[in-house]
């Protein structure tokens, strides 16, 4: 059975309580359970979708299983959900220096993003994937970052208004990952799942590019 959630943290809580065998969540949420796979979305790590394809293809191979299968948790599938872009309420903001003093909706569990925001002297506004869009749209923050699909899904055009814009620079490559308790499936099944997920890469990326 598949159970949809609107709050990723609630879904993770149910998974950790073993109310389900597998959770599909953003790598930002799953990285604490598999740090190796979590590095895919590190800021600036992968500059284009070609590199994402290469990395995910490599991780889908049998030899990579030792990096994805942990004693307690395993990643049994990864697919792209798009590069993260900056959405700003001021399209004139086109330099790093211009970010100083700006309020940025920042996921409170993404340490590299918090570091980046502090580094450019912006203000961290703790957020999560359920409320960052609302904060941007109501003016509580000046900037948020997300894959392109958020423009429609979170109605970010409200926050952009007439003066805003989307900075055409891929900050990071975000993915959805399937996380399971290692003892829920044998090694053969876990690997088969990874192979199936990678076989859907092109289909997933086509959806991403349509939104972009």
Task: State the predicted function of each range.
Residues 15-25, 103, 122-123, 137-147:
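Alpha-to-beta junction loops
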Residues 2-13, 108-111, 123-138:
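Short helix-initiation/N-cap motifs at beta->coil->alpha
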Residues 4, 8-17, 23-30:
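Internal catalytic or translocation cores that form aromatic/hydrophobic pockets or channels
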Residues 13, 26-119, 156-159, 170-212:
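Contiguous mixed-secondary-structure segments that line small-molecule binding/active-site clefts
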Residues 1-2, 87-100, 134-144:
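Short secondary-structure boundary segments
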Residues 109, 129-130, 147-150, 181-183:
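Histidine- and/or cysteine-centered catalytic micro-motif in compact active-site loops
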Residues 27-36, 133-138, 143-168:
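A ligand-binding cleft/hinge motif common to bilobed small-molecule-binding domains
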């Amino acid at each position: 059975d598949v159970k949809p959630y609107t709050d990723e943290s609630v879904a993770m809580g149910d998974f950790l309580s073993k109310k389900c065998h597998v959770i599909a969540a953003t790598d930002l949420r799953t990285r604490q359970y598999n740090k190796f796979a979590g590095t895919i979305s590190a800021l600036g790590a992968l500059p284009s979708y070609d590199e994402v394809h290469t990395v995910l293809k490599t991780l889908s191979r049998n030899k990579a299983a030792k990096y994805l299968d942990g004693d307690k948790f395993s990643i049994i599938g990864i697919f792209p959900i798009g590069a993260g872009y900056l959405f700003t309420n001021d399209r004139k903001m086109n330099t790093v220096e211009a970010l100083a003093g700006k309020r940025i909706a920042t996921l409170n569990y993404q340490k590299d993003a918090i570091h980046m925001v502090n580094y450019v002297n912006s203000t961290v506004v703790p957020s999560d994937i359920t409320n960052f869009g609302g904060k941007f749209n109501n003016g509580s923050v000046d900037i948020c970052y997300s894959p392109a699909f958020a423009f429609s899904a979170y109605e970010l055009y409200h926050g952009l208004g007439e003066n805003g814009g989307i900075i055409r620079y891929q900050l990071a490559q975000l993915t959805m990952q399937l996380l399971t308790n290692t003892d829920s499936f044998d090694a053969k099944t876990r690997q088969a799942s990874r192979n199936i997920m990678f076989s859907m890469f092109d289909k997933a990326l086509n959806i991403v590019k349509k939104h972009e």
